[in-house]
């Protein structure tokens, strides 16, 4: 039988360190740069439109205003480029931290799965050993059933040879019960042969192995009980046959004595006459 195994609960995943997964908070300078970049984005549209107008009529009307607008446009572009340069590294760092955390979780899950696989492989090894032992026991029991079946076949042949005597000595009900018992024994032995193949196919099904083994034990016990009953019945039949033969021989001897006694009584009477 399989030995009870303990289910090992997987350990809790490692808690992420605060310093590794903590996203750095933006400083005051970063906030100022962000506000300046947003303001510059608002100004870009206005200054761009005004720059187009300034290029058209700036040198004719007010070249100083055109120079100031161009300077503001260049400053806004420089601020946007600086903001994008600063924030690109921050977003990349955040994405890398998320990927590292997911990789740690995946690594932990893989280690837990490896431990479970090793535990299941050990359980399967012990189950296969127990199954081989049960199969050997079952085949030995089946061989014993076949030997007993051969003995019952020889006994049945003896009963067939003495059919006439059995009909005279015993009733038809006892013979019918004996035939029914032998037929049921044959059917159960035929049923055991596909069960042996079923046991081989069920080697990979661990959950149903215990149920199949219990059923086989029940069938084996029932067959043993029936074999014991049949052996007891055969003993009783043998004793009854011997008793009936003895009674018949006694009856025959009595009949012979009664038949011979009138002859003896008749012989003295003839002499006296």
Swiss-Prot record:
Record key words, sorted: Coiled coil, Host membrane, Membrane, Secreted, Transmembrane, Transmembrane helix, Virulence
Record family assignment: Belongs to the IncA family.
Annotated Gene Ontology cellular component terms: extracellular region; host cell membrane; pathogen-containing vacuole membrane
Name the record gives this protein: Inclusion membrane protein A
Compartments where located: Secreted; Host vacuole, Host pathogen-containing vacuole, Host pathogen-containing vacuole membrane
The protein's role, per its UniProt record: Chlamydia replicate within an intracellular vacuole, termed an inclusion. IncA is probably involved in the homotypic fusion of inclusions.
Spans traversing the lipid bilayer: 41-61, 64-84
Consequence the record notes for mutating residue 180 to D: In strain: Da/MT-566
Region (Disordered): 1-20, 254-273
UniProt remark on domains: IncA proteins share the same general organization: a short N-terminal domain, a large bilobed hydrophobic domain, and a C-terminal cytoplasmic domain.
Origin species: Chlamydia trachomatis serovar D (strain ATCC VR-885 / DSM 19411 / UW-3/Cx)
Effect of residue 90 to P: In strain: C/UW-1
Membrane topology: Multi-pass membrane protein
Coiled coil: 172-233
Effect ascribed to mutating residue 62 to T: In strain: H/UW-4
Subunit description: Forms homooligomers.
